[in-house]
Protein backbone atom coordinates (compact mmCIF):
# COMPACT_ATOMS: atom_id res chain seq x y z
CA UNK A 1 0.00 0.00 0.00
CA UNK A 2 1.42 3.40 -0.97
CA UNK A 3 0.28 6.78 0.35
CA UNK A 4 0.04 9.34 -2.44
CA UNK A 5 -1.65 12.23 -0.67
CA UNK A 6 1.25 14.63 -1.27
CA UNK A 7 2.28 13.48 -4.72
CA UNK A 8 1.81 15.06 -8.11
CA UNK A 9 -1.25 12.89 -8.66
CA UNK A 10 -3.21 14.57 -5.89
CA UNK A 11 -1.79 17.98 -6.76
CA UNK A 12 -3.15 17.45 -10.26
CA UNK A 13 -6.55 16.71 -8.77
CA UNK A 14 -6.57 19.90 -6.72
CA UNK A 15 -5.22 21.97 -9.59
CA UNK A 16 -7.86 20.66 -11.97
CA UNK A 17 -10.54 21.82 -9.55
CA UNK A 18 -8.91 25.22 -9.12
CA UNK A 19 -8.49 25.55 -12.85
CA UNK A 20 -12.14 24.85 -13.54
CA UNK A 21 -13.54 27.05 -10.77
CA UNK A 22 -11.18 30.03 -10.73
CA UNK A 23 -11.40 32.70 -13.44
CA UNK A 24 -7.98 33.94 -12.36
CA UNK A 25 -6.48 30.77 -13.77
CA UNK A 26 -9.07 29.93 -16.38
CA UNK A 27 -10.94 32.66 -18.26
CA UNK A 28 -14.51 31.97 -19.44
CA UNK A 29 -13.29 31.84 -23.02
CA UNK A 30 -10.57 29.32 -22.17
CA UNK A 31 -13.03 27.28 -20.15
CA UNK A 32 -15.40 27.19 -23.13
CA UNK A 33 -12.64 26.15 -25.52
CA UNK A 34 -11.61 23.36 -23.16
CA UNK A 35 -15.12 21.97 -23.53
CA UNK A 36 -15.06 22.22 -27.31
CA UNK A 37 -17.01 25.46 -27.76
CA UNK A 38 -15.65 28.51 -29.65
CA UNK A 39 -16.82 31.06 -27.07
CA UNK A 40 -18.32 31.30 -23.60
CA UNK A 41 -21.65 32.52 -25.01
CA UNK A 42 -21.75 29.56 -27.37
CA UNK A 43 -21.10 27.29 -24.42
CA UNK A 44 -24.01 28.83 -22.49
CA UNK A 45 -26.32 28.31 -25.45
CA UNK A 46 -25.19 24.71 -25.76
CA UNK A 47 -25.72 23.83 -22.12
CA UNK A 48 -28.96 25.80 -21.74
CA UNK A 49 -31.22 22.75 -22.33
CA UNK A 50 -29.83 21.11 -19.22
CA UNK A 51 -28.39 23.98 -17.18
CA UNK A 52 -31.66 25.84 -16.59
CA UNK A 53 -33.69 22.87 -15.30
CA UNK A 54 -30.62 21.60 -13.47
CA UNK A 55 -30.25 24.67 -11.29
CA UNK A 56 -34.00 25.05 -10.89
CA UNK A 57 -34.06 21.51 -9.60
CA UNK A 58 -31.23 22.06 -7.16
CA UNK A 59 -33.09 25.02 -5.64
CA UNK A 60 -35.90 22.69 -4.64
CA UNK A 61 -33.75 19.81 -3.45
CA UNK A 62 -32.19 19.25 -0.07
CA UNK A 63 -28.48 19.62 -0.76
CA UNK A 64 -25.67 18.93 1.65
CA UNK A 65 -23.84 22.18 2.33
CA UNK A 66 -21.31 21.08 4.91
CA UNK A 67 -18.18 21.13 2.74
CA UNK A 68 -15.29 20.62 5.10
CA UNK A 69 -12.69 23.34 4.55
CA UNK A 70 -11.23 22.88 8.02
CA UNK A 71 -7.59 23.11 8.95
CA UNK A 72 -7.81 20.23 11.39
CA UNK A 73 -8.58 17.81 8.54
CA UNK A 74 -6.59 16.67 5.55
CA UNK A 75 -7.21 14.59 2.48
CA UNK A 76 -5.56 11.19 2.29
CA UNK A 77 -5.38 9.17 -0.92
CA UNK A 78 -3.98 5.64 -1.05
CA UNK A 79 -3.28 3.31 -3.92
CA UNK A 80 -3.26 -0.31 -2.88
CA UNK A 81 -3.11 -3.86 -4.18
CA UNK A 82 -5.69 -6.50 -3.38
CA UNK A 83 -6.43 -10.11 -4.26
CA UNK A 84 -9.42 -11.13 -6.33
CA UNK A 85 -10.42 -13.76 -8.85
CA UNK A 86 -12.06 -14.11 -12.22
CA UNK A 87 -15.39 -15.83 -12.79
CA UNK A 88 -13.55 -18.96 -13.88
CA UNK A 89 -11.56 -19.05 -10.62
CA UNK A 90 -8.21 -17.58 -11.66
CA UNK A 91 -6.45 -15.67 -8.89
CA UNK A 92 -5.42 -12.10 -9.76
CA UNK A 93 -3.73 -9.25 -7.91
CA UNK A 94 -5.29 -5.88 -8.74
CA UNK A 95 -4.97 -2.26 -7.71
CA UNK A 96 -7.35 0.45 -6.59
CA UNK A 97 -7.49 3.77 -4.83
CA UNK A 98 -9.38 5.20 -1.87
CA UNK A 99 -9.53 8.91 -0.98
CA UNK A 100 -11.05 10.39 2.17
CA UNK A 101 -10.84 13.11 4.80
CA UNK A 102 -9.36 12.36 8.20
CA UNK A 103 -8.30 14.27 11.29
CA UNK A 104 -4.72 15.48 11.38
CA UNK A 105 -4.46 14.63 15.07
CA UNK A 106 -5.42 11.02 14.38
CA UNK A 107 -8.82 11.23 16.06
CA UNK A 108 -11.58 9.06 14.53
CA UNK A 109 -13.52 10.59 11.65
CA UNK A 110 -16.84 9.58 10.12
CA UNK A 111 -17.73 10.07 6.45
CA UNK A 112 -21.27 10.71 5.27
CA UNK A 113 -21.12 8.52 2.18
CA UNK A 114 -19.06 5.91 0.39
CA UNK A 115 -18.85 6.64 -3.33
CA UNK A 116 -17.96 3.70 -5.56
CA UNK A 117 -16.70 5.20 -8.80
CA UNK A 118 -16.23 3.01 -11.87
CA UNK A 119 -15.41 4.90 -15.04
CA UNK A 120 -12.18 4.55 -16.97
CA UNK A 121 -8.91 3.68 -15.31
CA UNK A 122 -8.06 6.45 -12.90
CA UNK A 123 -4.53 6.79 -14.28
CA UNK A 124 -5.68 7.50 -17.82
CA UNK A 125 -4.19 10.84 -18.96
CA UNK A 126 -7.04 11.87 -21.26
CA UNK A 127 -10.08 11.33 -19.05
CA UNK A 128 -8.70 11.57 -15.55
CA UNK A 129 -8.40 15.38 -15.34
CA UNK A 130 -11.79 16.04 -16.92
CA UNK A 131 -13.91 13.55 -15.01
CA UNK A 132 -12.39 11.61 -12.14
CA UNK A 133 -10.15 14.31 -10.74
CA UNK A 134 -12.56 17.13 -11.43
CA UNK A 135 -15.28 15.60 -9.28
CA UNK A 136 -13.39 13.52 -6.74
CA UNK A 137 -12.19 16.55 -4.71
CA UNK A 138 -15.77 17.83 -4.53
CA UNK A 139 -17.06 14.51 -3.29
CA UNK A 140 -14.27 14.17 -0.75
CA UNK A 141 -14.80 17.70 0.52
CA UNK A 142 -18.49 16.84 0.83
CA UNK A 143 -17.25 14.25 3.31
CA UNK A 144 -17.47 11.23 1.03
CA UNK A 145 -14.89 8.46 0.77
CA UNK A 146 -14.25 7.72 -2.91
CA UNK A 147 -13.31 4.16 -3.89
CA UNK A 148 -12.01 3.48 -7.40
CA UNK A 149 -10.83 0.27 -9.07
CA UNK A 150 -8.07 0.60 -11.64
CA UNK A 151 -9.76 -1.01 -14.62
CA UNK A 152 -7.02 -0.22 -17.10
CA UNK A 153 -4.22 -1.91 -15.19
CA UNK A 154 -6.53 -4.85 -14.60
CA UNK A 155 -7.24 -5.20 -18.29
CA UNK A 156 -3.67 -4.95 -19.51
CA UNK A 157 -2.25 -7.23 -16.82
CA UNK A 158 -5.06 -9.76 -16.82
CA UNK A 159 -6.45 -9.64 -20.36
CA UNK A 160 -9.30 -12.10 -20.54
CA UNK A 161 -8.77 -15.03 -22.85
CA UNK A 162 -11.65 -16.53 -24.84
CA UNK A 163 -12.19 -19.29 -22.27
CA UNK A 164 -12.29 -16.80 -19.39
CA UNK A 165 -15.50 -15.03 -20.29
CA UNK A 166 -17.68 -12.49 -18.61
CA UNK A 167 -15.40 -9.46 -18.35
CA UNK A 168 -18.10 -7.15 -16.98
CA UNK A 169 -18.81 -9.67 -14.27
CA UNK A 170 -15.08 -9.95 -13.63
CA UNK A 171 -14.98 -6.23 -12.96
CA UNK A 172 -18.07 -6.36 -10.77
CA UNK A 173 -16.61 -9.00 -8.46
CA UNK A 174 -13.32 -7.19 -8.37
CA UNK A 175 -15.08 -3.94 -7.47
CA UNK A 176 -16.52 -5.78 -4.46
CA UNK A 177 -13.06 -6.98 -3.42
CA UNK A 178 -11.66 -3.49 -4.03
CA UNK A 179 -14.34 -2.05 -1.74
CA UNK A 180 -13.48 -4.47 1.07
CA UNK A 181 -9.78 -3.60 0.80
CA UNK A 182 -10.59 0.14 0.83
CA UNK A 183 -12.78 -0.21 3.93
CA UNK A 184 -9.91 -1.96 5.71
CA UNK A 185 -7.58 0.94 4.88
CA UNK A 186 -10.13 3.45 6.12
CA UNK A 187 -10.53 1.52 9.35
CA UNK A 188 -6.76 1.51 9.87
CA UNK A 189 -6.89 5.32 9.75
CA UNK A 190 -9.86 5.65 12.08
CA UNK A 191 -12.31 6.53 9.29
CA UNK A 192 -15.75 4.88 9.29
CA UNK A 193 -19.18 5.42 7.77
CA UNK A 194 -21.68 7.40 9.85
CA UNK A 195 -24.50 5.38 11.44
CA UNK A 196 -26.94 7.05 9.04
CA UNK A 197 -24.46 7.07 6.16
CA UNK A 198 -24.91 5.21 2.90
CA UNK A 199 -23.19 4.16 -0.32
CA UNK A 200 -23.75 5.36 -3.89
CA UNK A 201 -22.61 3.19 -6.77
CA UNK A 202 -21.70 5.30 -9.80
CA UNK A 203 -20.47 4.13 -13.19
CA UNK A 204 -20.38 5.50 -16.70
CA UNK A 205 -19.06 4.55 -20.10
CA UNK A 206 -16.97 1.40 -19.68
CA UNK A 207 -17.89 1.39 -16.00
CA UNK A 208 -21.65 1.44 -16.59
CA UNK A 209 -22.04 -2.29 -17.13
CA UNK A 210 -19.70 -3.42 -14.29
CA UNK A 211 -21.59 -1.03 -12.02
CA UNK A 212 -24.86 -2.78 -12.79
CA UNK A 213 -23.36 -6.22 -12.27
CA UNK A 214 -21.99 -5.10 -8.94
CA UNK A 215 -25.46 -3.82 -8.02
CA UNK A 216 -26.95 -7.18 -9.02
CA UNK A 217 -24.36 -9.03 -6.95
CA UNK A 218 -25.09 -6.76 -3.98
CA UNK A 219 -28.83 -7.43 -4.19
CA UNK A 220 -28.64 -11.17 -4.82
CA UNK A 221 -25.36 -12.64 -3.53
CA UNK A 222 -23.54 -10.24 -1.20
CA UNK A 223 -23.14 -11.52 2.38
CA UNK A 224 -25.17 -9.78 5.06
CA UNK A 225 -22.12 -8.18 6.70
CA UNK A 226 -21.19 -6.57 3.37
CA UNK A 227 -24.66 -5.11 2.88
CA UNK A 228 -24.69 -3.82 6.45
CA UNK A 229 -21.29 -2.21 5.94
CA UNK A 230 -22.20 -0.45 2.68
CA UNK A 231 -25.94 0.29 2.94
CA UNK A 232 -26.17 0.78 -0.82
CA UNK A 233 -28.81 3.40 -1.52
CA UNK A 234 -28.60 4.09 -5.24
CA UNK A 235 -26.85 2.94 -8.41
CA UNK A 236 -26.26 5.39 -11.26
CA UNK A 237 -25.34 3.87 -14.63
CA UNK A 238 -24.80 6.33 -17.46
CA UNK A 239 -23.75 6.33 -21.09
CA UNK A 240 -22.99 2.63 -21.10
CA UNK A 241 -20.78 1.82 -24.02
CA UNK A 242 -17.97 -0.55 -24.84
CA UNK A 243 -17.50 -0.19 -28.59
CA UNK A 244 -14.35 -1.46 -30.19
CA UNK A 245 -12.68 1.88 -30.83
CA UNK A 246 -13.26 3.19 -27.29
CA UNK A 247 -11.53 0.28 -25.59
CA UNK A 248 -8.69 0.67 -28.06
CA UNK A 249 -8.29 4.32 -27.19
CA UNK A 250 -8.35 3.88 -23.44
CA UNK A 251 -5.91 0.98 -23.44
CA UNK A 252 -3.33 2.40 -25.83
CA UNK A 253 -4.08 -0.15 -28.53
CA UNK A 254 -3.57 -3.17 -26.26
CA UNK A 255 -4.53 -6.04 -28.61
CA UNK A 256 -6.15 -8.22 -25.94
CA UNK A 257 -8.62 -5.51 -25.09
CA UNK A 258 -9.20 -4.61 -28.71
CA UNK A 259 -10.39 -8.16 -29.20
CA UNK A 260 -12.33 -7.99 -25.96
CA UNK A 261 -14.01 -4.80 -27.11
CA UNK A 262 -15.31 -6.53 -30.21
CA UNK A 263 -16.84 -9.29 -28.10
CA UNK A 264 -18.18 -6.94 -25.46
CA UNK A 265 -20.05 -5.11 -28.17
CA UNK A 266 -21.65 -8.45 -28.93
CA UNK A 267 -22.50 -8.87 -25.25
CA UNK A 268 -24.90 -5.97 -25.37
CA UNK A 269 -27.14 -7.92 -27.68
CA UNK A 270 -26.94 -10.99 -25.46
CA UNK A 271 -27.35 -9.34 -22.08
CA UNK A 272 -29.64 -6.42 -22.81
CA UNK A 273 -31.99 -7.57 -25.54
CA UNK A 274 -35.26 -9.15 -24.41
CA UNK A 275 -35.53 -10.55 -27.91
CA UNK A 276 -32.62 -12.89 -27.24
CA UNK A 277 -35.15 -15.21 -25.63
CA UNK A 278 -36.96 -15.27 -28.92
CA UNK A 279 -33.96 -16.55 -30.79
CA UNK A 280 -31.85 -13.52 -31.69
CA UNK A 281 -28.29 -14.59 -32.46
CA UNK A 282 -25.68 -12.05 -31.41
CA UNK A 283 -23.23 -13.52 -33.88
CA UNK A 284 -25.56 -12.39 -36.66
CA UNK A 285 -26.30 -8.99 -35.17
CA UNK A 286 -22.75 -7.75 -34.79
CA UNK A 287 -21.89 -7.74 -38.52
CA UNK A 288 -25.24 -6.03 -39.12
CA UNK A 289 -24.31 -3.43 -36.51
CA UNK A 290 -21.16 -2.53 -38.39
CA UNK A 291 -22.68 -2.50 -41.86
CA UNK A 292 -26.11 -0.91 -41.40
CA UNK A 293 -26.31 2.86 -42.09
CA UNK A 294 -27.45 3.96 -38.61
CA UNK A 295 -25.71 7.34 -38.27
CA UNK A 296 -26.70 10.60 -39.91
CA UNK A 297 -23.93 12.93 -41.08
CA UNK A 298 -24.56 15.96 -43.27
CA UNK A 299 -28.03 14.71 -44.14
CA UNK A 300 -27.03 11.19 -45.15
CA UNK A 301 -26.92 7.87 -43.33
CA UNK A 302 -23.56 6.19 -42.82
CA UNK A 303 -22.40 2.96 -41.17
CA UNK A 304 -20.78 2.50 -37.78
CA UNK A 305 -17.28 2.28 -39.23
CA UNK A 306 -17.92 5.26 -41.49
CA UNK A 307 -19.10 7.21 -38.46
CA UNK A 308 -15.98 6.15 -36.63
CA UNK A 309 -13.83 7.44 -39.47
CA UNK A 310 -15.85 10.66 -39.63
CA UNK A 311 -15.90 11.54 -35.94
CA UNK A 312 -12.74 9.82 -34.71
CA UNK A 313 -10.34 9.53 -37.64
CA UNK A 314 -7.33 9.48 -35.32
CA UNK A 315 -8.62 6.29 -33.67
CA UNK A 316 -9.54 4.31 -36.75
CA UNK A 317 -6.04 3.28 -37.76
CA UNK A 318 -5.14 2.00 -34.30
CA UNK A 319 -8.39 0.02 -34.09
CA UNK A 320 -7.79 -1.82 -37.34
CA UNK A 321 -4.12 -2.31 -36.61
CA UNK A 322 -4.76 -3.60 -33.11
CA UNK A 323 -7.45 -6.08 -34.08
CA UNK A 324 -5.54 -7.52 -37.00
CA UNK A 325 -2.24 -7.66 -35.14
CA UNK A 326 -3.91 -9.65 -32.37
CA UNK A 327 -5.30 -12.10 -34.90
CA UNK A 328 -2.01 -12.40 -36.74
CA UNK A 329 -0.01 -12.99 -33.55
CA UNK A 330 -2.39 -15.08 -31.47
CA UNK A 331 -5.43 -16.21 -33.40
CA UNK A 332 -5.01 -16.21 -37.19
CA UNK A 333 -8.18 -18.29 -37.43
CA UNK A 334 -10.08 -15.16 -36.40
CA UNK A 335 -9.49 -13.63 -39.83
CA UNK A 336 -11.56 -14.27 -42.91
CA UNK A 337 -10.04 -14.61 -46.37
CA UNK A 338 -10.33 -10.85 -46.90
CA UNK A 339 -8.55 -10.08 -43.63
CA UNK A 340 -11.58 -9.20 -41.50
CA UNK A 341 -12.36 -10.65 -38.07
CA UNK A 342 -14.60 -13.71 -38.40
CA UNK A 343 -17.40 -13.59 -35.83
CA UNK A 344 -18.02 -17.31 -36.45
CA UNK A 345 -14.58 -18.54 -35.43
CA UNK A 346 -14.42 -20.96 -32.43
CA UNK A 347 -12.73 -18.46 -30.11
CA UNK A 348 -15.40 -15.85 -30.68
CA UNK A 349 -18.11 -18.46 -30.20
CA UNK A 350 -16.46 -19.55 -26.95
CA UNK A 351 -16.68 -15.96 -25.78
CA UNK A 352 -20.36 -15.83 -26.67
CA UNK A 353 -21.01 -18.98 -24.67
CA UNK A 354 -19.30 -17.51 -21.60
CA UNK A 355 -21.10 -14.22 -21.98
CA UNK A 356 -24.44 -15.98 -22.25
CA UNK A 357 -23.62 -17.98 -19.11
CA UNK A 358 -22.29 -15.17 -16.91
CA UNK A 359 -23.48 -11.83 -18.27
CA UNK A 360 -27.20 -11.98 -17.71
CA UNK A 361 -29.38 -9.27 -16.17
CA UNK A 362 -32.75 -10.76 -17.05
CA UNK A 363 -32.96 -12.64 -13.74
CA UNK A 364 -32.30 -9.59 -11.54
CA UNK A 365 -35.05 -7.50 -9.95
CA UNK A 366 -33.29 -4.47 -8.41
CA UNK A 367 -33.99 -4.01 -4.70
CA UNK A 368 -32.55 -0.49 -4.49
CA UNK A 369 -32.81 2.66 -6.60
CA UNK A 370 -31.26 2.24 -10.05
CA UNK A 371 -30.87 5.20 -12.41
CA UNK A 372 -30.06 4.59 -16.07
CA UNK A 373 -29.17 7.75 -17.96
CA UNK A 374 -28.40 8.15 -21.61
CA UNK A 375 -28.40 10.85 -24.24
CA UNK A 376 -29.98 10.40 -27.66
CA UNK A 377 -27.10 12.53 -28.90
CA UNK A 378 -24.55 9.89 -27.92
CA UNK A 379 -23.57 7.96 -31.02
CA UNK A 380 -21.29 5.64 -29.07
CA UNK A 381 -24.21 3.47 -27.97
CA UNK A 382 -27.67 3.93 -29.54
CA UNK A 383 -30.39 5.10 -27.22
CA UNK A 384 -32.67 2.23 -28.21
CA UNK A 385 -30.15 -0.31 -26.88
CA UNK A 386 -30.02 1.41 -23.50
CA UNK A 387 -33.80 1.60 -23.46
CA UNK A 388 -33.90 -2.18 -23.90
CA UNK A 389 -31.73 -2.42 -20.81
CA UNK A 390 -34.23 -0.32 -18.88
CA UNK A 391 -37.12 -2.48 -20.06
CA UNK A 392 -35.27 -5.57 -18.91
CA UNK A 393 -34.38 -4.30 -15.45
CA UNK A 394 -37.70 -2.59 -14.79
CA UNK A 395 -39.88 -5.47 -15.95
CA UNK A 396 -41.36 -3.30 -18.70
CA UNK A 397 -41.69 -0.37 -16.31
CA UNK A 398 -43.29 -2.28 -13.44
CA UNK A 399 -40.44 -1.86 -10.93
CA UNK A 400 -40.71 1.65 -9.40
CA UNK A 401 -37.09 1.49 -8.22
CA UNK A 402 -35.70 1.51 -11.78
CA UNK A 403 -35.62 4.82 -13.65
CA UNK A 404 -34.65 5.65 -17.22
CA UNK A 405 -33.76 9.23 -18.14
CA UNK A 406 -32.99 10.80 -21.45
CA UNK A 407 -30.56 13.57 -20.60
CA UNK A 408 -30.44 16.46 -23.10
CA UNK A 409 -26.99 17.02 -24.51
CA UNK A 410 -25.28 18.03 -27.71
CA UNK A 411 -24.09 15.67 -30.41
CA UNK A 412 -20.51 14.48 -30.27
CA UNK A 413 -18.60 16.67 -32.70
CA UNK A 414 -14.86 17.13 -33.14
CA UNK A 415 -15.24 20.94 -33.03
CA UNK A 416 -17.98 22.49 -30.92
CA UNK A 417 -20.67 20.63 -29.07
CA UNK A 418 -20.39 19.04 -25.66
CA UNK A 419 -19.69 15.37 -25.30
CA UNK A 420 -22.78 13.76 -23.69
CA UNK A 421 -20.37 11.71 -21.62
CA UNK A 422 -19.20 14.91 -19.93
CA UNK A 423 -22.71 16.27 -19.35
CA UNK A 424 -24.02 13.08 -17.81
CA UNK A 425 -20.86 12.57 -15.79
CA UNK A 426 -21.33 16.05 -14.37
CA UNK A 427 -25.00 15.47 -13.57
CA UNK A 428 -24.47 12.06 -12.05
CA UNK A 429 -21.39 12.95 -10.05
CA UNK A 430 -22.84 16.13 -8.59
CA UNK A 431 -26.12 14.45 -7.83
CA UNK A 432 -24.49 11.56 -6.03
CA UNK A 433 -22.22 13.93 -4.14
CA UNK A 434 -24.72 16.44 -2.83
CA UNK A 435 -28.22 14.95 -2.77
CA UNK A 436 -29.34 13.35 0.46
CA UNK A 437 -31.90 10.80 -0.68
CA UNK A 438 -33.33 8.94 -3.69
CA UNK A 439 -36.56 10.92 -3.51
CA UNK A 440 -34.61 14.06 -4.36
CA UNK A 441 -32.90 12.23 -7.20
CA UNK A 442 -36.26 11.33 -8.67
CA UNK A 443 -37.43 14.91 -8.23
CA UNK A 444 -34.39 16.17 -10.07
CA UNK A 445 -34.70 13.80 -12.99
CA UNK A 446 -38.40 14.43 -13.43
CA UNK A 447 -37.41 18.01 -14.22
CA UNK A 448 -34.47 17.41 -16.55
CA UNK A 449 -35.55 14.32 -18.43
Where are these regions (language model features)?
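Accessory cap/linker subdomain of secreted extracellular hydrolases
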Residues: 238-363
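Alpha/beta-hydrolase active-site loop
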Residues: 165-189, 215
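N-terminal targeting or regulatory segments adjacent to alpha/beta-hydrolase or S9 domains
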Residues: 1-75
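N-terminal cap/lid segment of alpha/beta-hydrolase-fold proteins
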Residues: 56-109
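Short beta-strand/loop motif that positions the catalytic acidic residue
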Residues: 366, 371-378
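Short, surface-exposed "cap/lid" segments of acyl-processing enzymes
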Residues: 86-95, 99-142
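C-terminal catalytic histidine-bearing segment of alpha/beta-hydrolase fold enzymes
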Residues: 347, 352-353, 380, 387-388, ...
Amino acid sequence: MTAVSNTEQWELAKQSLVTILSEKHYTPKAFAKALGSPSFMSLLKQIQPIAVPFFKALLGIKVRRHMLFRRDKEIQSYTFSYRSQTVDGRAVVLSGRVTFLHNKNGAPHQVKTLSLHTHQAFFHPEWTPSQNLMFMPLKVLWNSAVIEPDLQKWGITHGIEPDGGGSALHMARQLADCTVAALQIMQQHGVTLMPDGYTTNWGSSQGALPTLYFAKWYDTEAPQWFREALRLRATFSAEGDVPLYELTTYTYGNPNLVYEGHILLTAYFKAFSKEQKGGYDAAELVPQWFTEPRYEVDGRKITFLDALSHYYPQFTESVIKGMKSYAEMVAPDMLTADGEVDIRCPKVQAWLACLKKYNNLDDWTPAHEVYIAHSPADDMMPYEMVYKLYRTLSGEGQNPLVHMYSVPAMRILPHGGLNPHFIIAFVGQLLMACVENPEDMRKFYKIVK
